[in-house]
Amino acid sequence: MDYRVLLYYKYTTIDDPETFAAEHLEFCKSNNLKGRILVSTEGINGTLSGTKEDTDKYIEHMHSDERFADMTFKIDEAEGHAFKKMHVRPRNEIVALGLEDDVDPRVTTGKYYSPSEFKEALEDEDTVILDARNDYEFDLGHFRGAIRPDITRFRDLPDWIRENKDQLDGKNIVTYCTGGIRCEKFSGWLVKEGFENVGQLHGGIATYGKDPETKGQYWDGKMYVFDERISVDVNQVEKTVIGKEHFDGTPCERYINCSNPECNKQILVSEENEDKYLGACSYDCAKHERNRYVAKNNISDEEWNRRLENFKDVPEHAHA
């Protein structure tokens, strides 16, 4: 495989994010890279794809800047680009937690757990393992025994913690996310909230899965990624499928976006049921006048109505 996908972040001071973003975009485009990078005064958060040669140039370029000299890159092999375009955008935060009183992970953050230390924490009955990702990420794959916060956006996590404080009080708390960036800030917030013994998986799931000692053990399912691959394997020892098909509950790891452009909910759906239910998560979405699946496949009104009848046999959860 000649292509690679890079995942990286660094909390560091960038004085002029707008100028940095514009110049960085030009550099990335000139080196045939594609991906999404967020830049703010608090640092950089990126994932991009390119050939081995082009990604090597990018890594070398970043490491030559003293602000990013020690930045860690998590690298996956790929068969081609994982993104369609290249975006570098200035933002208020490089990860959106939206706190009234922001947390600087360079000052306050949870204890770093190496992959082997995290594996020990997974085996410890007195430790709570808290997934800091969104519900649809958790539903595709997660660490065995981890708590699933009922959230669809990272910024909703603090409210969920406050509402479920009783699950965490007096426990050792270790949190994890895809590459580590969300946990840097989130674990710092937990410390500020008064929780004691707060830790985080250093380098995230991506690092744990490649560690030669842990080999991704105790991970069930796949890891959701925010690019065209959608998901990647983590556990090198045993493979399990924990995702459940939206309509029939059978094992499934195929995510699509609901065909209603006003919904866009991510659902696990087989190809057969995507076709049967018009790529939608519910009857209301399937009959939406701008259904993208209907438009893309040139489905006639007669056929559209025929497939809407399929929803009569669907369990209640898919009628919402």
Swiss-Prot record:
The active site is at C177. It is an enzyme of class 1 (oxidoreductase). Catalyzes oxygen-dependent 5-hydroxyuridine (ho5U) modification at position 34 in tRNAs. One of its GO terms (biological process) is tRNA modification. It catalyses: uridine(34) in tRNA + AH2 + O2 = 5-hydroxyuridine(34) in tRNA + A + H2O. The gene is trhO. Residues 123-217 form the Rhodanese domain. InterPro entries: Rhodanese-like_dom, Rhodanese-like_dom_sf, Rhodanese_C, TrhO, TRHO_N. PROSITE patterns: RHODANESE_3 (PS50206). GO terms for molecular function: oxidoreductase activity, acting on paired donors, with incorporation or reduction of molecular oxygen. It holds the Pfam family Rhodanese. Transmembrane segments: none annotated. This is tRNA uridine(34) hydroxylase. Its EC number is 1.14.-.-. Belongs to the TrhO family. PANTHER family: RHODANESE-LIKE DOMAIN-CONTAINING PROTEIN 7-RELATED, THIOSULFATE SULFURTRANSFERASE/RHODANESE-LIKE DOMAIN-CONTAINING PROTEIN 2. It comes from Staphylococcus haemolyticus (strain JCSC1435). Keywords: Oxidoreductase, tRNA processing.
